């Protein structure tokens, strides 16, 4: 994730895109608009479906020169040749994921609102740390809130990419960039809207020194 310009990190949602066709269609719209990081997130137990979809997304990401990260499944990331895996606090061991995926793999860690969790994750080999939720979230409505000041502290403390997640829209994303986030992770705001391309471009066009984009959330 580059530090000179923020990254939009798109996260899929199996409820919003229940079929492989709908998933690939909306993801391709986002990638075509300039999104370069994608996380495949499907918590279902349907392993054949998840394998099929992950392989399809890997092909799309290769076409658009984007990174594919698998949520919570190191084995699936290895199987499809994904660029890495994202692990929650109860999703698996960072050290084991690094051993399986290799030194070049991207490993992300959910750290909620805790600098201590982030410090521990980085010590274990995480590539980036994710904080949030910062706003009301449709994907995880019961997640504990995080304060904007957390991002400034993280930016001062860590040199890795700082990912903000939770309720991010084109109308509030600039606040997070100004506070210290390098990466905006978005799910519902991007993929629940019919005009995925427009939403992606609005998110990509945010700047930390500008007023929030004047678009509806």
Curated annotation (Swiss-Prot):
Mg(2+) binds at residues 72, 91. It is an enzyme of class 2 (transferase). Pathway: Cofactor biosynthesis; thiamine diphosphate biosynthesis; thiamine phosphate from 4-amino-2-methyl-5-diphosphomethylpyrimidine and 4-methyl-5-(2-phosphoethyl)-thiazole: step 1/1. Binds 1 Mg(2+) ion per subunit. Its cofactor is Mg(2+). InterPro entries: Aldolase_TIM (IPR013785), ThiamineP_synth_sf (IPR036206), ThiamineP_synth_TenI (IPR022998), TMP_synthase (IPR034291). 4-amino-2-methyl-5-(diphosphooxymethyl)pyrimidine binds at residues 39-43, 71, 110, 140. Pfam families: TMP-TENI. GO terms for biological process: thiamine biosynthetic process; thiamine diphosphate biosynthetic process. It catalyses: 2-[(2R,5Z)-2-carboxy-4-methylthiazol-5(2H)-ylidene]ethyl phosphate + 4-amino-2-methyl-5-(diphosphooxymethyl)pyrimidine + 2 H(+) = thiamine phosphate + CO2 + diphosphate; 2-(2-carboxy-4-methylthiazol-5-yl)ethyl phosphate + 4-amino-2-methyl-5-(diphosphooxymethyl)pyrimidine + 2 H(+) = thiamine phosphate + CO2 + diphosphate; 4-methyl-5-(2-phosphooxyethyl)-thiazole + 4-amino-2-methyl-5-(diphosphooxymethyl)pyrimidine + H(+) = thiamine phosphate + diphosphate. Its EC number is 2.5.1.3. GO terms for molecular function: magnesium ion binding; thiamine-phosphate diphosphorylase activity. 2-[(2R,5Z)-2-carboxy-4-methylthiazol-5(2H)-ylidene]ethyl phosphate binds at residues 137-139, 167. Signal peptide: none annotated. GO terms for cellular component: cytoplasm. Keywords: Magnesium, Metal-binding, Thiamine biosynthesis, Transferase. Gene3D superfamilies: Aldolase class I (3.20.20.70). HAMAP family: TMP_synthase (MF_00097). NCBIfam families: thiE (TIGR00693). Belongs to the thiamine-phosphate synthase family. Condenses 4-methyl-5-(beta-hydroxyethyl)thiazole monophosphate (THZ-P) and 2-methyl-4-amino-5-hydroxymethyl pyrimidine pyrophosphate (HMP-PP) to form thiamine monophosphate (TMP). This is Thiamine-phosphate synthase. It comes from Saccharophagus degradans (strain 2-40 / ATCC 43961 / DSM 17024). The gene is thiE.
